[in-house]
C-alpha cells in the first residue's frame, strides 16, 4: 500500500518536512517513490504538487493524519468531521438514557 507521509529533514530543532509517497512498510526517512511537496511548521510555508498528489490519491494512496490536514488546507481533500467516540460502558449508558429522555419528552410535547 502506498502512503502519503511527511519525511523529516533539516537541522536539529529547525526541522522541515517533505511530503512524499512511499511504501507503507518503509522507514520514515527511507527512500520515497516520489516527492510531492514541502512543509515548514515554523513559517507555515507549504508547497504542494497538486497534479502529482491528485494522481497518487487516484491510485489509492492513503494519507496520514498530518498529511490529510495539509491536503484539506490546500483544498485537495474535503474536510471530514469524525464523530467523537465515547469510551466506557457507563458513559454509553448515560448517553442512551439521555437520548431516551429526549425522545419521550418530544413525544409528550407533540
Swiss-Prot record:
HAMAP family (UniProt xref): Ribosomal_bS16 (MF_00385)
Annotated GO MF terms: structural constituent of ribosome
UniProt keyword annotation of Ribonucleoprotein present: yes
NCBIfam families per record: S16
GO biological process, alphabetically ordered: translation
Gene name of the record: rpsP
Protein name from the UniProt record: Small ribosomal subunit protein bS16
Biased composition (Basic and acidic residues): 81-104
CC terms in the record's Gene Ontology section: cytoplasm; small ribosomal subunit
Protein family (similarity comment): Belongs to the bacterial ribosomal protein bS16 family.
Assigned keywords, A-Z: Ribonucleoprotein, Ribosomal protein
